[in-house]
Amino acid sequence: IVTIDLLEEAGVPLAELGSQTLAALGEVYPPWMSPSNPADIWPAIEHSGPRKVYETALKAVMEDPAVDSLVMHLFTSMIDGSMFAELARLKEELGKPVVAWLAGVGDTFRTLRSELEDLGIPTFDEMQRCVSVLAAIRRHARDSTHKQPRTGRQG
């Protein structure tokens, strides 16, 4: 919830997930829980296992036309970087920025950080910085696509 507040303050709106995305998420969620955005995947992980949930959820969310960027909050003790190879491919193919806020310590933290950064996914150990960087990436992309060429003449 704090992340959503920070995203809102930074001008990054929360996407409304499409029906196909919600259906794909529903495949890995427990029967008693309906998926939404933000995607609370912990119950899904307990129900379907981390690899299946991350791979299913990340693919579905990245392919949703309403989603233009992704913030992940990852607990490093239960994840390995090989789970994110498809995400890195989708990130490049779809041109959607992805950032990760990592929670953890020690070797597992350092290993996951290195694996994600090798895949071109920036990582942060502080939520505010993660959100600020994503907002800056989005502003840069928006400003780059809306600039008009300069002719040297004034109106």
Question: Which residues does each PLM region occupy?
Answer:
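Peripheral docking tails and interdomain loops at the edges
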Residues: 1-13, 86-155
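A C-terminal functional module that forms or caps the active site or interfaces directly
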Residues: 80
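Short glycine-cluster motifs
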Residues: 1-67, 72-75
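Short, glycine-/Ser/Thr-/acidic-enriched flexible segments
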Residues: 46, 76-77, 105, 129
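Charged helix-capping and loop-helix junction motifs
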Residues: 55, 83-88
